[in-house]
């Protein structure tokens, strides 16, 4: 189904299909709280995470996380590899055996660092160049790889736009690096299995990368990535728009088995 909608260039349908797979594997709805995918955690337990974040954070000596726990990535950051921190959150209402099951799930969750660059032909050599991958061609442009500027805390109007040639092929290079969450556990084949206790059979962890233009609801590229053990690099080829002006492409890094771990990045282009 995903291949079919990708062939048609249907962005919204591709995202919906991926979300459907996530819901089937975790046996939860997309609109459910992501912490409810954790074994033994039900809706009546969610207040424990809010209570800890406001009243017990200093006492529990969690990691560098400073906000209320409202998602799986925030829970991972708050625990910072310490089962004792998780126990301090859940011990008022869960037994030690249930907390151990929760920790086995949380400590195995994949958290990815994502960096994005664009490789192609440019008119000038800007300061955002990452590396030189070729000399000057007949068109007068240098072929380099440029980092996509981060949008954190910067208004959309103030973004550093990447200048591209119209209707020319470029390559979006996505580097995925997995956080070391296993704390000394041996690397092995079993580690590639996803944490899906409500799914009837074992499933390998994988990721789906989708590049699209939201304004036109158009899917530009899609690629599946298997289990990320340490770090991996993925390339997505795309063409710059034929029309001149500014546009925004969006990269979606989506799990094919977990709810609440997806990431997205805007790539601001000026043609």
Language-model regions, residue ranges each:
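A eukaryote-biased signal for short, well-structured alpha-helical docking elements
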Residues: 83-111
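Short acidic/polar inter-strand loop motif in beta-rich domains
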Residues: 253-263
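Short, hydrophobic beta-strand segments
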Residues: 223-226, 232-243
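Short beta-strand edge segments in extracellular beta-sheet folds
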Residues: 266-271
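Surface-exposed loop/edge segments in extracytoplasmic proteins
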Residues: 215-223
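C-terminal helical accessory/scaffold domains
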Residues: 1-55, 69, 76-82, 104-135, ...
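Helicase-associated low-complexity/disordered flanking segments
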Residues: 189, 263-265
């Amino acid at each position: 189904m995903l291949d079919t909608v990708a062939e048609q260039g249907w962005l919204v349908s591709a995202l919906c299909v991926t979300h459907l797979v996530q819901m089937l594997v975790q046996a939860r709805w997309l609109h459910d709280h992501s912490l409810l995918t954790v074994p033994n955690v039900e809706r009546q337990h969610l207040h424990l995470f809010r209570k800890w974040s406001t009243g017990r954070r200093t006492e529990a000596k969690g990691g560098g996380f400073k906000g209320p726990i409202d998602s799986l990535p925030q829970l991972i950051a708050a625990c910072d590899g310490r089962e004792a921190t998780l126990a301090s959150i859940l011990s008022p209402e869960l037994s030690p055996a249930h907390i151990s099951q929760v920790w086995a799930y949380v400590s195995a969750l994949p958290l990815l660092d994502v960096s994005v660059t664009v490789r192609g032909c440019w008119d000038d050599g800007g300061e955002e160049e990452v590396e030189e991958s070729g000399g000057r061609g007949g068109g007068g442009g240098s072929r380099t790889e440029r980092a996509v500027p981060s949008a954190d805390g910067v208004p959309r109007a103030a973004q550093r736009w990447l200048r591209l040639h119209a209707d020319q092929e470029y390559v979006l290079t996505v580097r995925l690096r997995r956080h070391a969450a296993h704390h000394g556990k041996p690397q092995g084949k079993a580690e590639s299995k996803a944490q899906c206790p409500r799914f009837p059979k074992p499933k390998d962890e994988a990721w789906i990368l989708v590049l699209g233009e939201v304004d036109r609801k158009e899917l530009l590229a899609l690629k599946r990535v298997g289990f990320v053990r340490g770090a991996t690099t993925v390339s997505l080829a795309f063409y710059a728009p034929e029309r001149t002006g500014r546009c925004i492409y969006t990269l979606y890094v989506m799990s094919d088995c977990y709810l609440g771990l997806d990431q997205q990045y805007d790539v601001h282009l000026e043609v």
